[in-house]
Amino acid sequence: MEEHTPHGIGNHAVILTEPCGEIAEKIRAFLEDIGYVGFSNFDIKYDQRDGKYKVFEINCRQGRSNYYVTGAGYNIAKLLVEDRVEGKDLPFVLADNPSLWRVVPRKVAFRYIVSDYHQEMKDLMRQGREVRPLFYHKDRPLLRTLRMEKNLLGHFQKFKRYYQRKS
């Protein structure tokens, strides 16, 4: 699910990771063919009209939402240090562990994501397979905590105004 405010459109609000080996293999082959080395992510959409995934953008960087990779069990910072600092030869690994990444309140996620995904989301939360990159239990000074809570509450109004509810 993405944000839909005029300023935030295109930013991720919720990500459910799932294995997708066929697409990952095609993208890996493409990156190797062009000699690309480094972090990247691709914007991919599933087209229900023809049952195919459509790749429409590569982002040659890691951004806020890339923390979902850590949520799936692969710490990007650790891999970067092992590769560039320690000089380790790291094999290709497909991050195929399911996880839930979100920056919106739980109620907003459940209200605006189609109900087909609700049980999976609940299961991942119960299993501790949820990551919330804006909240870290050791980084809770009062002013920051208040700002983060205000930010969270603001999503209720933003989604109500700009996003059509899914059922």
Regions found by a protein language model. Name each.
Residues 45, 61-64, 102:
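Basic side chains
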Residues 48, 76-79, 101:
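Short, surface-exposed, charged/polar-biased interaction segments
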